[in-house]
């Protein structure tokens, strides 16, 4: 019995060693001096397409040049950058305004999808210059500073913005109707946590509070629900 156990252990050890291939770094890129140290985000989402191109995202407060084009910031903006298989800078676009990209994915054709949160007014950049603007949550007609509105955007392989959807929550009508409910920032929001592309459709999971309406669909959170759509 001892010999059998010893042989099994050795075999497992050999398999473990063999399963660790040598990794060679093909290329490395970085963007410097675009965000204060106090606000550095070390978990920015990235994605690699079926074609081998890499899409990188992040936060920035200072303008920088990428692929020969200046990427400009307003407040703490977000960027979406595309690198070729050899690390060449292909294109970059900005989400100009207070925004954070939280998740990213691609489809088989190399289109890229991003989702996250934003506040106030957000401009979605496009390499063809046809930007789109979305407004976030307001209270008493004034935009709130909290990044509580959600968004999903699609760019094609050339960085052309193809579609944008925003998810802007508001108080539950039945609570407002009581006359004794006075909402505060944070009482209602829409957070898209993850997205995935499969069989021609984009799927997303989200957590939300309050009432959010989009394209005929209603997401009613009674103050804190989780849904997948």
Positions of the model-derived regions?
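Bacterial Sec-dependent N-terminal signal peptides
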Residues: 1-25
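A sequence-level/structural motif corresponding to short, flexible coil/turn segments enriched
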Residues: 20-229
């Amino acid at each position: 019995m001892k010999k059998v156990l010893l042989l099994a252990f050795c075999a497992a050890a050999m398999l473990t060693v063999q399963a660790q291939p040598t990794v060679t770094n093909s290329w490395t890129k970085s963007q410097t001096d675009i965000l204060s140290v106090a606000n550095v985000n070390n978990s920015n989402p990235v994605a690699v397409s079926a074609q081998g191109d890499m899409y990188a995202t992040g936060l920035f407060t200072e303008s920088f040049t990428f692929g020969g084009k200046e990427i400009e910031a307003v407040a703490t903006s977000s960027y979406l950058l595309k690198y070729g298989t050899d690390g060449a800078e292909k294109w970059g676009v900005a989400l100009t305004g207070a925004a954070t990209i939280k998740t990213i994915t691609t489809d088989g054709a190399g289109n890229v999808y991003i989702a996250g949160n934003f506040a106030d007014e957000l401009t979605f950049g496009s390499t063809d210059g046809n930007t789109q603007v979305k407004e976030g949550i307001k209270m008493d007609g004034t935009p709130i500073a909290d990044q509580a509105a959600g968004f999903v955007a699609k760019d094609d392989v050339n960085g052309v913005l193809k579609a944008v959807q925003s998810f802007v929550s508001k108080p539950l009508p039945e609570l407002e109707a009581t006359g004794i409910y006075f909402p505060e920032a944070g009482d209602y929001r829409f957070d898209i946590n993850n997205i995935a592309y499969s069989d021609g459709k984009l799927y997303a999971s989200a957590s939300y509070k309050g009432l959010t309406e989009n394209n005929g669909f209603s997401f009613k959170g009674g103050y804190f629900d989780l849904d997948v759509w």
